[in-house]
From Swiss-Prot:
<dbReference type="GO" id="GO:0042777">
    <property type="term" value="P:proton motive force-driven plasma membrane ATP synthesis"/>
</dbReference>
<dbReference type="InterPro" id="IPR009335">
    <property type="entry name" value="T3SS_HrpE/ATPase_suE"/>
</dbReference>
<dbReference type="InterPro" id="IPR002842">
    <property type="entry name" value="ATPase_V1_Esu"/>
</dbReference>
<dbReference type="GO" id="GO:0046961">
    <property type="term" value="F:proton-transporting ATPase activity, rotational mechanism"/>
</dbReference>
<dbReference type="GO" id="GO:0033178">
    <property type="term" value="C:proton-transporting two-sector ATPase complex, catalytic domain"/>
</dbReference>
<keyword id="KW-0066">ATP synthesis</keyword>
<dbReference type="InterPro" id="IPR028987">
    <property type="entry name" value="ATP_synth_B-like_membr_sf"/>
</dbReference>
<keyword id="KW-0813">Transport</keyword>
<dbReference type="GO" id="GO:0005524">
    <property type="term" value="F:ATP binding"/>
</dbReference>
<protein>
    <recommendedName>
        <fullName>V-type proton ATPase subunit E</fullName>
    </recommendedName>
</protein>
<comment type="function">
    <text>Produces ATP from ADP in the presence of a proton gradient across the membrane.</text>
</comment>
<dbReference type="GO" id="GO:0046933">
    <property type="term" value="F:proton-transporting ATP synthase activity, rotational mechanism"/>
</dbReference>
<comment type="similarity">
    <text>Belongs to the V-ATPase E subunit family.</text>
</comment>
<keyword id="KW-0406">Ion transport</keyword>
<dbReference type="Pfam" id="PF06188">
    <property type="entry name" value="HrpE"/>
</dbReference>
<keyword id="KW-0375">Hydrogen ion transport</keyword>
Length: 208
């Protein structure tokens, strides 16, 4: 019985020690587990929020990129349309106008009228001096002189027109003043292009 009593006492002592040491440890462990769970929950929530933020940022970036891409496409489309307009103007408008001028400005009657208009313009301004008239290299000087008549050719230094190096049209030089009044086909093409280009664009590209 004494041994049992000793064992009982030993058990009581062990139980007491366990009660004193293990219970607080269990409570501490429980608190640690609880805190860990709360912290894990908070971390998960923060991770979810961060993930949502990243997704929103990615969506915004993608949307901005898409808008920039759309804007770039629109701008590229506008540039392509403008390039097309310029190509059409060059091919249809300027080249066709140039061909028409080459035909018209090499007509002796037209060349004569241009020379006459230039001489009369100089006279109207009271400008005197030696006048030299030049016509296109593809035009007959004899035919132009006949169309002008003596009233105009008599005012020219050479008593008639000379053949120039340009295609068609006419030029008048006032030698003392070193002036050149230029109505050659090249100059006429530039003048007509500037005057008619707007009307041509509106007519051809009004729906663009």
């Amino acid at each position: 019985m004494a041994d049992l009593s000793a064992q009982d006492k030993l058990k009581q002592i062990c139980d007491a020690l366990r009660e004193e040491t293990l219970k607080p440890a269990e409570e501490e462990a429980g608190s640690i587990v609880h805190n860990a769970r709360e912290q894990a929950k908070r971390i998960v929530e923060e991770a979810k929020e961060e993930a949502q933020r990243i997704i929103r940022s990615a969506e915004e970036t993608a949307d901005q990129t898409l808008k920039k891409g759309e804007a770039a496409l629109v701008q590229a489309g506008k540039r392509s349309l403008e390039n097309l307009k310029q190509a059409v103007e060059t091919k249809i408008f300027r080249e066709s106008l140039g061909e028409w001028l080459d035909h018209v400005a090499t007509d002796p009657e037209v060349s004569a009228k241009l020379v006459q208009a230039l001489v009369q313009a100089v006279d109207a301004q009271g400008i005197s001096g030696n006048l030299s008239a030049y016509i296109g290299k593809h035009v007959s000087a004899r035919a132009v002189n006949e169309a002008l008549g003596k009233e105009i050719t008599s005012k020219l230094k050479e008593k008639g027109v000379s053949v120039g190096k340009f295609s068609g049209g006419a030029q008048l030089k006032v030698e003392e003043r070193n002036w050149v009044l230029d109505m050659s086909s090249e100059v006429l093409l530039d003048l007509l292009t500037r005057f008619l280009q707007k009307d041509f664009r509106e007519m051809i590209f009004q729906s663009c």
